[in-house]
Design a protein with these regions (language model features):
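Local beta-strand/beta-hairpin segments that build beta-sheet-rich folds
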Residues: 4, 55-56
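A short, charged, amphipathic alpha-helix used as a generic interaction element across diverse proteins
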Residues: 60-78
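Negatively charged, low-complexity tracts enriched in Asp/Glu with abundant Ser/Thr
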Residues: 1-14
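Short aromatic-glycine-(Arg/Gly/Cys) micro-motifs in beta-strand/loop hairpins
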Residues: 14-55, 79
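Short secondary-structure boundary micro-motifs
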Residues: 6-8, 41-43, 65
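Boundary/linker segments flanking structured domains
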Residues: 1, 73-84
């Protein structure tokens, strides 16, 4: 059974279409690392990637809405997200 698992892991490494990560089978374990292309695509977010939450709140003025967006971006940055 473990042998079949290693074969499956090797096939999945080979089939990784968009080069999101690179894998290497060492003994019976699969070691993966994120490639630079994936880091460019999703920034520094923890995997899996998801959309940032947006509220459907309506602000009184354009300036107030813009300020709220800046506050949200600052909060994301503080939590370790890289804002593009």
């Amino acid at each position: 059974m473990p042998v079949r698992l290693v074969v499956t892991l090797k096939q999945s490494v080979r089939r990784c279409l968009y080069r999101r990560w690179e894998g290497q089978v060492v003994g019976r374990e699969l070691r993966t690392k994120t490639v630079a292309l994936e880091r460019m695509y999703r920034g520094n977010t923890p995997y899996p990637i998801g959309r940032t939450r947006r509220t459907a709140k309506v602000y009184a003025s354009h300036a107030e809405g813009a300020r709220a967006l800046k506050v949200m971006a600052a909060r994301r940055r503080a939590r370790g997200y890289r804002v593009a």
